Swiss-Prot record:
Keywords: ATP-binding, Kinase, Nucleotide biosynthesis, Nucleotide-binding, Transferase. Belongs to the thymidylate kinase family. It comes from the Bacteria. ATP binds at G13, L14, E15, G16, A17, G18, K19, S20. The keyword Nucleotide-binding applies. It holds the Pfam family Thymidylate_kin. It is an enzyme of class 2 (transferase). It catalyses: dTMP + ATP = dTDP + ADP. This is Thymidylate kinase. One of its GO terms (cellular component) is cytosol.
Length: 212
């Protein structure tokens, strides 16, 4: 992404990890440095992407939406987001802060759904053509604690209704992916909000220092 002047920062993690709060904090920190930002989310972020999100998240499609269909819908939404939102923003120097990206698919579909990682990687290569974030923060939280926090937000969506074993597989896969990709920054999200925000602030300030 050296030809693009903006930066893509991705916040990853299980339900209840505090991704939305982290996105808001990153935006605030960047704004203090007079950096123009936009935020987005996956799946979604575009008109088509939000329609696909409503399908993927809808509890009515429990036991109806095939895992392969879900995977393809996610990549369809991601392509639209990259081409319609992320790349145009990066090209004019804006920094994009995304709630989820490619790592979620590897963790949720590869780990949670037990899909073949080789297939996912091949699909990724075809759809994304090597497009990657400049910085990924993974908020690591115990699955049980994450679901308690998520439940406090209200009714569960189709993904949130999965078993706790599903989320443990995702959690384990995230850890494997972080070990395989040392550029991903893992932050302990089991701690207090103040401690988590302090860690995020340190990472972002260092990243800004090296990229301005």
């Amino acid at each position: 992404m050296s030809s693009l002047t903006g930066k893509l920062i991705v916040i990853e993690g299980l339900e209840g990890a505090g991704k939305s709060t982290a996105v808001n904090l990153v935006v605030e920190l960047l704004s203090q440095k007079k950096i123009s930002t936009i935020t987005t989310r996956e799946p979604g972020g575009t008109k088509i992407g939000e329609i696909l999100r409503s399908i993927i998240k809808n509890p009515e499609y429990n036991n109806v939406l095939d895992d392969r269909s879900e995977l393809l819908l996610l990549y369809a939404a991601r392509i639209q987001l990259i081409e319609q939102v992320i790349k145009p923003a990066l090209n004019v120097g804006q920094w994009v802060i995304a709630d989820r990206f490619e790592l979620s698919t590897l963790a949720y579909q590869g780990g949670g759904r037990k899909m073949d990682m080789r297939v996912i990687n091949e699909l990724s290569n075809f759809c994304l053509k090597g497009f990657k974030p400049d910085l990924t923060l993974y908020l690591d939280i115990n699955p049980e604690l994450g679901m308690i926090r998520a439940k406090s937000r209200g009714k569960f969506d189709r993904i949130e209704q999965e078993s706790i074993e599903f989320f443990h597989r995702i959690h384990d896969t995230y850890h494997i992916l972080v070990k395989q990709n040392p550029e991903i920054i893992m932050i302990d999200a089991n701690r207090s909000l103040e401690e988590v925000q302090s860690s995020i602030q340190s990472v972002i300030e260092e990243f800004i220092e090296h990229n301005l």
